[in-house]
Amino acid sequence: MADNAPPSADSAKTPEEIIKEYDLLPKLIPYLDRHLVFPLLEFASGQEETQESIDEITKSKYELLKQTNMTDYVANLWQEINHSDTIPEEFVKKREEVVQRLQQYVEDSSKITELLQDDNVVGNLRSDKVANLKFLEEQHGATVDMVNTLYDYGRFQYSCGSYGNAAELLYQFRVLSTDNDKVASATWGKLASEILTTNWEGAMEEVQKVKDSIDTRLFNNPLGQLQHRTWLIHWSLFPLFNHEPARDVLTDLFFSPAYINTIQTSCPWILRYLTAAVITNRQRVHKNSSLYQKQLKDLIRIVRQEEYEYQDPITDFIKALYIDFDFEEAQKKLGEAEEVLRSDFFLVAAADAFVESARHLISESYCKIHQRIDIKDLSTRLGLSQDEGEKWIVNLIRDTRVDAKIDYKEGTVLMNHPPQSVYQQVIEKTKGGFFRTQVLSAAVAK
């Protein structure tokens, strides 16, 4: 009966409706610093087609940044919103105040910054911050207030949009300060600054420092750890898809018990990005390794668990292919997923790689359960023409080295599936149980 049912309204959605329905911007914004939100709004503005929508985003930019010290840019936004060539006096006055405060910070921090630029002084510094501060006080007249000025100056530069200067000042502060709360705050500030200057190696160093700080400083505060890990997960999305070496590190981090628990508890929408990371990892060096297979199995398990908490075409692709074994639904969801990927700030650059890898996964799964495969049928499931599908299958057989023969006359592929021993089947089934036991043991140990 279900086979003869009319198409659902869901199947008739336009690309625009799909993009609007699965827009994650409202969920992401609460966990990002306002300066980190700005690139997302810029991207969203470029995606809009109507002037009305663009104007709304311009107003959002203004509301986002008006409390910062980016006075010139905020004034330009005001002019754009109000269609005015003049700048109100309040912006002129604030700009003067910002310049004066910058000059004051330069004066107040001049002595300590000069000391930190002196190779002879730096050469005498050790890993002991207390000893360093004592050395600077006794030998060079530096004070704790001077060190704290670096922190305030760094935050001020950040508010002005001078992220490179902010990163350097916060780093200098962190070298000397023994104030753990301010050091933690400075580390978050330096992470944001490295992201905004697209210094991905520096950003990844700060991700590790923030992670360590959460683990140690908030050890006796589970709720605080949960909140801070939620923030770190969201901030980590920037290097995740922009810095190749970060992919493995952050994917492993997200799959670790503490962070996968955070995702499932606080932000299940992050499954979109974890799914995209795992799927696109297929094209990378370790695509045939046990690590990739383990990540894929873990992902399938988590998508199944969170099905009632979060769904989008990207996670639904996994569900259709590996949970429901519905190849037609998988192809449909892949088409929708491509629309979502191209409209997502973090995933737009990974869209082609995702689609390519997803087609491979469909092909591999389809070939595993069929002895004789109709090339035309498989091509349709992959969204390819018959000629494209034929080339695709030839490449798939070559790349994966499966035992298969193509009958060009009949337009079919004959798969030679070796029988799997009962012993091997038992091993495969017990692997999953062993993993679950490990996770439960880790949870009980806490």
UniProtKB/Swiss-Prot annotation:
It is found in: Cytoplasm. SMART domains: eIF3_N (SM01186), PINT (SM00088). HAMAP family: eIF3e. Pfam families: eIF3_N (PF09440), EIF3E_C (PF21357), PCI (PF01399). This is Eukaryotic translation initiation factor 3 subunit E. Belongs to the eIF-3 subunit E family. Component of the eukaryotic translation initiation factor 3 (eIF-3) complex. GO terms for cellular component: eukaryotic 43S preinitiation complex; eukaryotic 48S preinitiation complex; eukaryotic translation initiation factor 3 complex, eIF3e. It comes from Coccidioides immitis (strain RS) (Valley fever fungus). GO terms for molecular function: translation initiation factor activity. Component of the eukaryotic translation initiation factor 3 (eIF-3) complex, which is involved in protein synthesis of a specialized repertoire of mRNAs and, together with other initiation factors, stimulates binding of mRNA and methionyl-tRNAi to the 40S ribosome. The eIF-3 complex specifically targets and initiates translation of a subset of mRNAs involved in cell proliferation. Residues 251-420 form the PCI domain. One of its GO terms (biological process) is formation of cytoplasmic translation initiation complex. Disulfide bonds: none annotated. InterPro entries: eIF3e (IPR016650), eIF3e_N (IPR019010), PCI_dom (IPR000717), WH_DNA-bd_sf (IPR036390). Its main location: cytoplasm. Keywords: Cytoplasm, Initiation factor, Protein biosynthesis. The gene is INT6.
